[in-house]
């Protein structure tokens, strides 16, 4: 049997190292939060990030339309709704579509770092259950571009699949 033809010819691997890319400070949204965009695919609704959160961070309650995979590298964090299930270094968390929760880090804890793969949309609510916003790969990309511009970083380096759908001829 012959080998399959490569669909995408590559001269190099598509690889990023967070130690070689500047963090994007999104403290204007969540104080002290820094993110590294790794892969943003607005067409398919997938966003892959490395995140740094300071102690005391609390994200608004949010509903996931798609699955989330989160691997904790440093620190301890949890969801307000599941105090018995704190995540620690080495923890892998799978969040199925349709889940809703409130991320928090203890005030007396250490900074948290982790790697996440998010599919779909996060629908964000305030403490009273009122709709605030939707976060998705496209909106996150705009947040990163705006924050990088404000910080004078220039164009952040991340992997983005080829552009929007178009006719071939």
What are the roles of these predicted feature ranges?
Residues 32-39, 45-63, 96-100:
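Conserved short histidine dyad/triad with adjacent acidic residue
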Residues 50-52, 76, 117:
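Residue-level recognition of well-ordered beta-strand positions that form the cores
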Residues 1-45, 130, 134-138, 142-169:
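A short, N-terminal "cap"/entry segment at the start of jelly-roll beta-barrel domains
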Residues 84-87, 97-127:
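Ligand-binding loop in jelly-roll beta-barrel domains
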Residues 49-50, 82, 126-129:
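A short secondary-structure junction signal
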Residues 54-55, 64-82:
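Glycine- and acidic-residue-biased ligand/ion/polar-headgroup-sensing regions
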Residues 42-43, 69, 78-105:
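Short acidic-glycine-tyrosine-enriched beta hairpin
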Residues 46, 68, 111:
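Conserved catalytic motifs of the protein kinase core domain
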